[in-house]
Amino acid sequence: MRNSYRFLASSLSVVVSLLLIPEDVCEKIIGGNEVTPHSRPYMVLLSLDRKTICAGALIAKDWVLTAAHCNLNKRSQVILGAHSITREEPTKQIMLVKKEFPYPCYDPATREGDLKLLQLMEKAKINKYVTILHLPKKGDDVKPGTMCQVAGWGRTHNSASWSDTLREVNITIIDRKVCNDRNHYNFNPVIGMNMVCAGSLRGGRDSCNGDSGSPLLCEGVFRGVTSFGLENKCGDPRGPGVYILLSKKHLNWIIMTIKGAV
């Protein structure tokens, strides 16, 4: 599920201050196509319960990066090597989670830091169906106009259920000034420097409910994690998808968490 919500900023001064926070301070796919089976072997399907799914990326043999708002329970499954949700596939590796590590500065109200690491009970068997998606070497921002891709098993339109098969859509990074203007999010919520907006200004190309946690790849580099959008309005040009940027501080947290885990 890509989270969909609205939040009211108390004043313009608060909004401006949030936009200027330095980086060192603490969905089915809409408008896309089914991918060639197992052509995105880093994709992870998270079966949270019988009614809820998320996605993620395998970033080490026993580590998955997803969104913090994806709520797991003891029966939640981490499925590697999947193309279809329902079909039995010999490529699938089904695992359980040993421990969850939500980003310590995650704020559910603003969705800042909507990231979570999942340490798996066992290591994945790496093959042509299951591979690691490497983190970017630098936590650089992504320039407006950059072409990106996002994949997932989420909704294909707002009244649909999940897609049974993995789909992907091409989307474009949109300037934060545009995403925050009165014709788009209007600072509700604030799209800050540790987030990026991506979609189409004409609408119709987006991530959606069920795609939360999916990796955002821009020019082949892992740049963000699917977070939220307008409630029940996936693909609406007024609310492009919002992704948590893999900024320097987020990358440092990921690296230190993995190194420090037992």
UniProtKB/Swiss-Prot annotation:
| Catalytic site positions | 69, 114, 212
> What EC number(s) is this enzyme filed under?
3.4.21.78
Residues forming the Peptidase S1 domain are 29-259
Highest taxon of source: Eukaryota
Q: Is the Glycoprotein keyword given for this protein?
A: yes
Q: Which reaction does it catalyse?
A: Hydrolysis of proteins, including fibronectin, type IV collagen and nucleolin. Preferential cleavage: -Arg-|-Xaa-, -Lys-|-Xaa- >> -Phe-|-Xaa- in small molecule substrates
- Cysteine disulfide partners in this protein: 54-70, 148-218, 179-197, 208-234
Expression is induced as follows:
Dexamethasone (DEX) induces expression of isoform beta and represses expression of isoform alpha. The alteration in expression is mediated by binding of glucocorticoid receptor to independent promoters adjacent to the alternative first exons of isoform alpha and isoform beta.
**Keywords linked to the UniProt accession:** Cytolysis, Disulfide bond, Glycoprotein, Hydrolase, Protease, Secreted, Serine protease, Signal, Zymogen
- Show the SUPFAM superfamilies listed in the entry: Trypsin-like serine proteases
At which residues is glycosylation annotated?
170
State the Gene Ontology BP annotations.
apoptotic process; cytotoxic T cell pyroptotic cell death; granzyme-mediated programmed cell death signaling pathway; immune response; killing of cells of another organism; negative regulation of DNA binding; negative regulation of endodeoxyribonuclease activity; negative regulation of oxidoreductase activity
Subunit structure of this chain's protein? Homodimer; disulfide-linked. Interacts with APEX1.
Q: What is this protein called?
A: Granzyme A
Gene field = GZMA
